Amino acid sequence: MKKYVLKRVGMSLLTLLIIVFVLFVLVRIMPGNPFPSERMSAEQIANKRAELGLDKPVLVQFWDYMTKLLQGNFGKGTSLYNGAPIKTVLKTAVSNSFRIGGLAILIGTAVGLLLGITAALNRGKFLDGFCTVFSIIGVCVPSYVFLIFLQYYFSYKIPVFPYFFDINRFAFSSILPSVSLSLFTMSTVARFTRNEMVEVMDSDYVRLAESKGIYGSRLVRRHVLRNALIPIVTVLAPLIVDLLTGALVVEKIYGINGIGKLMVDAIAGEGVDYNYVLALGILYSALYIGIMLVVDLLYGVLDPRIRVSARGD
Amino acid sequence: MEMLNEKAILEIRDLDITFRTNAGSIHAIRGVNLDLQKGETVAIVGESGSGKSVTMKAATGLLDSNGVVNRGQVLYRCREADGSEEVVDLLQMSKKELRRRINGRHIAMVFQDPMTSLDPTMQIGPQIMEGMLLRTKLSKAEARARAVELLELVGITDAEKRMKSYPHQLSGGMRQRVVIAIALSGDPDILICDEPTTALDVTIQAKILELIKDIQSRMGLSVIYITHDLGVVAKVADYVNVMYAGRIVEVGNVNEIFYEPQHPYTWGLLSAMPDLDTEDDRLYSIPGSPPNLLHEPPGDAFAPRNAFALKIDEKADPPLFKISDTHYAATWLLHPDAPKIELPPELKARLERARKEAERYL
């Protein structure tokens, strides 16, 4: 097991390194650069390039970048925020996005599980149908449409929640965006939980448990959920990454200074900000790889078939 | 509630079950009667889909949710630990009541496929102990000791160590032994074995059958075997119920069924059994396939596949004709007015051989 973990961590780091390199080269060869040519003369641009080290060979630039990165230094923006250190800007954005995304994950998973379990336990009855319809709507309606709907009813018609994100009333003003972001996760988790549970409830081992007299909540908890939840972890992982890395449109509509908004600014601002694009790309990838790693390890904890090797004595 | 027979422990009376499916209603069980006496072994034999498993699942409250019991009774003589005795109709009990009072404690089941019938996320020790801890006042240590004992009883070596194994670490035969240990953990009166050896290879099959037989005599269990394997039936059963399309078409003790079968379907089943001495180079199989019970045919459901079918078979379902006190068969051939029909010669020769062989062992 220890060996397996080390191997997985090593592979993850290697993957990340490759991603950073590809990103690094890609931003430089793709169209667009950090300098708005209509406002800068050729000379100014050349000076700026030299200042940023962009005139050096790509591999040298990469080496410089990596040495700084390994010290935890993302560098400065090439055009955005007048060259403020990326770390500081990123910190605020990450904290905003993570808190709103985290709340969305909590709501989505908890309510989704609850809906899925309710549907599975009432298979074929009204509640099951209701949950199915709900999940289809939840998967189909984009979160920002739902956000606008919520804003209309709960900020305008009944003024309970603020119209826009307010960093000073953090918890209160993150409710609307979190709820609208959670809808997709909620529906996906609900649908998946329901289907997995129904399958497990039809399995031979649940029949055997019943035939030895297990029933009710013990049967559901110990035999049905325990087995149904294992595959749910897999669908949950990418959903978590999606939510943590911010939602472009929702952040824009609700005026949240999050990662999503930062990404849009980095690409579609005054010019393409190489360092921001890179920093955000690394963040996305690291999160994704990290969560996948956690899921793989969690699988081992949840599923003895992976943890304990076959016939192992 | 009264039982017909005072020695009986389980009596199924006129059980009738329909399944609701998207395609329509399937009349899967059509008036089944079955008797089980204490200490006896009864087999239910039939092709896939004849309703063998459904009958026993209904009797233990494990029927799939789309199954509807139209009528019938499953009477069980429930003996409690304090010696009190009561005849209960299992079909009248709620699921919860069944699980609490009956499943595991009185009626336990062994399923067909040991590869899928154990919970993959639970060690086998806790799986055996689970029922005990729920039902009895045994402490965890006592339940554990009892579980180890049971594992030894079903012939698992290194029982103490195996308690911590997960199902995937055991072979098919071992898993089936664990399933049997689980079934025995509640000290049941009746053990229902639903094709317990179908998924196992032949050498293991024989061992598992021996094990069940051995435990049966030691613990005084009554056993119901659900199987399509007449070889298994011949080895273990006292009484045999031959089931076809949701009806029991012939019932008798094992000698009557094997040496004096009366129903053409039983003839077919016996002829289809592989046999070393048969001179034919082809193995007989019953022509056609079981009827689709979505569209219940009028008359005898077996008639279209029956070479000996009479005209009346197309119009009316035959009643059970009595041949002896223990032997009944539902075929119009037994009607006094029916033409006398000789057994197919190959089968006749075969039954003769079987009888002689049996005599040699007596």
Regions found by a protein language model. Name each.
Chain A
Residues 6-16:
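N-terminal signal-anchor/signal peptide hydrophobic helix marking the start
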Residues 11, 19, 107-108, 135-138, ...:
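Transmembrane alpha-helical core residues of multi-pass small-molecule transporters
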Residues 55-113:
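An internal, D/E-rich "acidic patch" concept
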Residues 23-29, 65-67, 133-162, 180-184:
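Membrane-water interface segments at the C-terminal ends of transmembrane alpha-helices
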Residues 47-50, 64, 68, 88, ...:
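Short amphipathic alpha-helical coupling elements at transmembrane boundaries
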Residues 50-57, 73-83, 167-170, 265-275:
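Membrane-interfacial helix-loop-helix junctions in multi-pass membrane proteins
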Residues 2-3, 94-127, 143, 168-313:
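Alpha-helical transmembrane segments of integral membrane proteins
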Residues 16-63, 158-176:
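Hydrophobic alpha-helical transmembrane segments of membrane transport/permease proteins
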